Amino acid sequence: MRCLPVFVILLLLIASAPSVDARPKTKDDIPLVSFQDHAKRILQTFESRYDCCKTFECCHWG
């Protein structure tokens, strides 16, 4: 029970600390969202090609 007040104080200090990036942004930084969108697009392309090849209508990989 003696640890509980210390734990609460530490949580309050962590929550109130300012958010600072570990490294400054450069002009080449790309947001993570664009990587996720790109990955989704690639997966959708493979899925559409797989569906097409299941029916043997237009099986082309290129």
From Swiss-Prot:
PTM remark: Contains 2 disulfide bonds that can be either 'C1-C3, C2-C4' or 'C1-C4, C2-C3', since these disulfide connectivities have been observed for conotoxins with cysteine framework V (for examples, see AC P0DQQ7 and AC P81755).
Highest taxon listed in the record's lineage: Eukaryota
GO cellular component, one term: extracellular region
UniProt propeptide residues: 23-48
Residue numbers bearing the Tryptophan amide modification: 61
InterPro entries found in the cross-reference section: T-conotoxin (IPR031565)
Location within or outside the cell: Secreted
Signal peptide coordinates: 1-22
UniProt keyword list: Amidation, Cleavage on pair of basic residues, Disulfide bond, Secreted, Signal, Toxin
Entry domain remark: The cysteine framework is V (CC-CC).
Protein family according to the UniProt entry: Belongs to the conotoxin T superfamily.
Full protein name: Conotoxin Pn-014
Organism: Conus pennaceus (Feathered cone)
